[in-house]
Regions:
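Interaction-mediating elements
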Residues: 1-80, 85-231
Length: 231
């Protein structure tokens, strides 16, 4: 970053993080103690987003929300990610997109924290890398994190965002894919409609695949009491 100015350093979780300006743009770069670069966060305008990201956002569920901020995350060895901070009334969400417009995740922004340290690239074990390459050939690695002793890897495969979870010994546990209600088999929808949750609103639908079965997890909400359940 030869044009960097107004540089300020701080330690964040063992990473050395530089906040600076370059050519009038606010940026942040993450390094380890040995000087290895991991990620750069760059503030950009909505107009600077790739056309595919703008098209996906404008066709999505948050199109009517106000875009408050846009960040571009350049990461060592992993996908470039674009983060749109959107708000409506008292609600705020961070929307993560790949360069080709795949919505990777939607995260409620409850604390106003703009730190994207959770998107730092992580090294995967050979067993996990080999499994993903075999089961999802050509998949692109977006993110990986340790969660409750498991390793969760976000990938893009066949134009969709998948979350692949591995447990003890890097054994594959399940893969989750967000789907539309229209993609759910009729028998599953009929079962839901005839259950105690048949009149509840549907918030989200995920398809799970594991080594021994396939199932759907449907998040529902009672419009009267605002109670929520997953069935």
């Amino acid at each position: 970053f030869p044009a960097a100015s107004h540089v300020e350093w701080e330690d964040k979780g063992g990473y050395m993080v530089a906040d600076f300006r370059s050519a009038g743009t606010v940026m942040q770069a993450w390094f380890d103690a040995a000087g290895k670069w991991y990620m750069t966060e760059e503030d950009i305008s909505y107009a600077e987003l790739p056309r595919a990201v703008r098209t996906a956002y404008e066709a999505g569920d948050y199109a009517a929300w106000h875009v408050d901020d846009v960040d571009k995350l350049l990461r060592n060895g992993q996908e470039t990610v674009y983060v749109l901070e959107v708000e409506r009334a008292e609600q705020e969400f961070d929307l993560y997109y790949s360069e080709d417009g795949v919505l990777l995740r939607e995260v409620p922004d409850r604390d106003g924290n703009d730190d994207h340290g959770d998107m730092l690239p992580q090294e995967l074990s050979k067993a996990i890398s080999d499994f993903i390459a075999r089961k999802y050939p050509g998949a692109r690695i977006v993110d990986a994190e340790r969660e409750k002793g498991n390793t969760e890897v976000d990938i893009i495969f066949a134009g969709k965002a998948l979350e692949v979870c591995f447990g003890t010994g890097d054994a594959w546990l399940w893969t989750k894919t967000g789907v539309r209600l229209s993609e759910v088999p009729d028998v599953v929808r009929r079962t839901l409609q005839s259950s105690q949750y048949g009149t509840w609103g549907i918030d989200d639908v995920d398809l799970y695949e594991s080594p021994d079965r396939v199932w759907y997890a449907i998040e529902v909400e009672d419009p009267q009491s605002e109670r929520e359940a997953t069935v």
